[in-house]
């Protein structure tokens, strides 16, 4: 018999009775999740924030450089399976990257567009030829 679970949406865990084992808190993060969060925070602090004003003034050559650096760190490949040279991380790690990237001003949109509009549809819906062509680094 197939079991179904109710999805906890938004802040529902605050106002509804929820099994505590279904709520994830920072104390539950694995060492790998903490590491990717720290890597992203350091990247944003050291690479993005120093040029955020330049980006806001449409000096987009910085965006290209920053995306290349993010790619070298694996920050563009969290949801890409290892088979295609990605990190194949879990959704919590992917969410942590997005959270830490959110302080990066407009660059967080550049990053989000690349991973959310660019790569993720290919991961989820692309055929083998498309994945092999577009997903490798």
Language model features: what each stretch is:
Residues 1-32:
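Intrinsic disorder at enzyme termini
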